Regions:
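Conserved alpha/beta catalytic core and glycan-binding cleft of carbohydrate-active enzymes
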Residues: 123, 313-315, 333-496, 503, ...
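Catalytic cores of secreted or luminal carbohydrate-active enzymes
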Residues: 508-529
Length: 639
């Protein structure tokens, strides 16, 4: 495809100032200089190529436009910083290319472009030239409104999704994949119907191995070609925005793939990773670790985050494997890691990288989200950088997720002995801004799907899960559900097949789908469920100590004191008659939602539609309500 729009002539495409800023680690638009860019030189249209390869003896561009001739297109080394560049006339978009890097010893390396905007469909490994500047965005209203959002006081209900296995294409020639545009037309209606606020997309940056789910990246600046071209991905984001749905990307700065065409030993030396394998390799994952102390590497990563924001209008990044970056000994045995200059196990360069990243990104783009998947008790992950925090917007509450799953899979007989696993998270809830995640990691590798973690017969499993989801949506913290879990997918997730959509024809699954939809509607309708998430001002236990009956009851409170909600949940198969519960006010408590309704797959046991509180001490309060609490029942009242 020919370059359609006329390009301005650019005699000095990469200036000395560009080279200086990149060497300093602060050229946040470096992706506009390195890589492949349509340009004009001496009146001729073509493509400008730039690459950082400081140790190379020579670099050539080889591609479909020059017959992969290894001598046809030599690049010029511009200065001591190691950037090589060349303008090649007549090259249009859609062409395949690689950099042929020759080392001082004569070794030849055939590398994909680290800044490529498009890649050859796997198993091919070439980069492709692309035009990412001519797409006509129509999401101005969304982008303007985003600037004014304080997400701590807004509902955040995230649908974690893997495009390739959400729904498979029936035509064999498509390799099972829907195009980004086809996916957009399907997913938007689903998300709107269910009332999710955001979608979190796995595996968008280009990667070679399907089984890595996108967590072993080779092309940080290229949306994967499995689902189409760059402008197809822009269409997806634009359509989601037009329908008031935010887009979060899984972002993987923790490590990268070792494939020969990737970043490893890029110019014959370790320029992206540390040359010491104790610092530059992940033994458990078989991947390379970025060298966060190197200015050009930090620049590559921070500019990458900004690239997705500016060029693709992304609304947030979920940073994968943060703990593996913070600790030098993460996943390593004695002798496999090197201590920092103080003799400790903290990765000082990675800490500084996160502070730099969040300061630049959140300081430049108000309303953007940076989310840390951090699995330890590292302090101040969402603390302000000026207070020595890492500066993230939110942190996944992995502790809550672990405790929740461990408790819910217990036989009810043993739950009383583990009662406080479900209440523990509130003891540290105000330490960070949390998201409660039930992610893909919990439904793979023989962990079972969410519904099959539950004990009992099939109807018991579904009743348990409805109770669990009610607890999750009532608990302080933003929400994340992995695809399929909102209709109780029964098989574990696999990237090789689509979700079992046929289950929506089954009463229990259809009921679960409707129930999660009601929870999402409730969550978005009532400010008490989201506007005060990290303070006791928004949450109050009514009874967190009823371990003998395995019940939990609590309030969610709004800042204006209106339309507060009361949650009561019975985690046993026993009906508790004349269940008395202390309440804060002598009011009428009106039922909003009951998990036992038949339309949700429940047993049909009725919970009173309205209960008048009476005077009388209970749970250290002056008023109480009384009801019969059915087995495996969750109820939500408004007052």
């Amino acid at each position: 495809m020919a370059v359609k729009e006329k390009k301005e002539e650019n005699k000095v495409f990469i200036s000395e100032a560009d080279q200086y800023l990149f060497a300093q680690g602060t050229h946040y638009d470096i992706y506009k200089k390195l890589g492949a860019h349509p340009s004009v030189e001496n009146g001729k249209e073509g493509m400008f190529f730039g690459v950082w390869a400081p140790n190379a003896a020579s670099v050539h561009v080889i591609g479909s436009f020059n017959g992969w001739d290894e001598s046809a297109s030599p690049m010029e080394k511009l200065g001591p910083g190691g950037i090589h560049a060349v303008f090649i006339p007549g090259v249009s978009t859609g062409e395949m290319y690689k950099f042929l890097i020759t080392t001082p010893s004569g070794e030849k390396l055939y590398k994909a472009d680290p800044f490529a905007n498009y890649a050859e469909m796997r198993p091919g490994t070439a980069s492709r030239t692309a035009d990412i500047t001519s797409f006509k965005w129509t999401d101005e209203v969304w982008m303007k409104e985003r600037e004014g959002k304080d997400h701590n006081k807004e509902p955040l209900a995230i649908y974690e999704c893997h495009i390739g296995s959400w729904m498979r294409h029936p035509r064999p020639e498509e390799q099972g994949f829907y195009n980004y545009r086809e996916f957009a037309d399907r997913i938007v209606e689903y998300l709107k119907e269910m009332k999710y606020t955001h979608i979190e997309l796995m595996g968008i940056a280009e990667y070679p191995y399907d089984g890595s789910w996108g967590y072993q990246v080779t092309g940080y600046y290229a949306p994967t070609s499995r689902y189409g071209e760059p402008q197809d991905f822009m269409y997806l984001v634009n359509k989601l925005h037009k329908n008031k749905i935010g887009v979060i990307l899984d972002w993987v700065p923790a490590h990268f793939a070792t494939d020969a065409h990737g970043l490893g030993r890029f110019d014959g030396e370790c320029i992206f990773e540390d040359p010491d394998p104790r610092k530059g390799e992940h033994p458990d994952w078989g991947t390379k670790i970025f060298n966060y102390g190197k200015t050009e590497v930090k620049n590559f990563l921070i500019a990458n985050a900004l690239f997705w924001i500016k060029e693709y209008h992304i609304d947030g990044i979920r940073v994968d494997a943060v703990a593996s970056m913070l600790y030098l000994d993460y996943g390593k045995q004695d002798g496999q890691w090197v201590a920092n200059k103080y003799g400790g196990n903290k990765n000082l360069e990675a800490i500084e990288f996160f502070k730099h990243l969040n300061s630049v990104v959140l300081g430049t783009y108000p309303g953007f989200l940076t989310i840390a998947e951090e699995s330890t008790a590292w302090p101040k992950v969402t603390g302000k950088v000026e207070d020595d925090g890492l500066g993230f917007s939110f942190k996944w509450n992995m502790g809550w997720m672990h405790d929740f799953c461990e408790y819910m899979k217990l036989d009810p007989y043993f739950r009383k002995d583990n009662h406080y696993a479900m209440t523990f998270a509130m003891s540290y809830n105000d330490s960070e801004n949390y998201i409660l995640p039930l992610s893909h990691d919990e439904v793979v590798h023989l962990k079972c799907s969410m519904v099959n973690k539950m004990p009992g017969y099939q109807v018991d499993k579904y009743a348990n899960l409805r109770c669990g989801y009610t607890y999750m949506f009532g608990h302080a913290g933003k929400k994340l559900l992995f695809m399929g879990q909102d209709f109780a997918q029964e098989r574990e997730w696999s990237e090789e097949r689509e979700l079992d959509w046929f289950l929506l024809g089954e009463d229990l699954n259809k009921g679960m789908h409707e129930y999660v939809k009601e929870l999402l509607k409730l969550y978005r309708k009532y400010p008490c469920l989201y506007e005060i998430d990290n303070s006791w001002d928004g949450f109050e236990w009514l009874n967190c100590d009823d371990k003998d009956r395995s019940t939990y009851s609590f309030l969610r409170k709004a800042s204006n004191g209106k339309n507060n909600l009361l949650f009561v949940i019975n985690m046993t198969p026993i009906k508790w008659e004349n269940y008395k519960l202390g309440v804060p006010a002598r009011k009428k408590y009106k039922l909003l939602l009951s998990s036992t309704e038949e339309r949700f797959g429940g047993c049909g046991a009725e919970i009173p539609k309205e209960i008048q509180a009476k005077k009388g001490t209970c749970d250290y309060r002056n008023y109480h309500i009384t009801l019969d609490l059915p087995p495996y029942a969750a109820a939500v009242f408004v007052f």
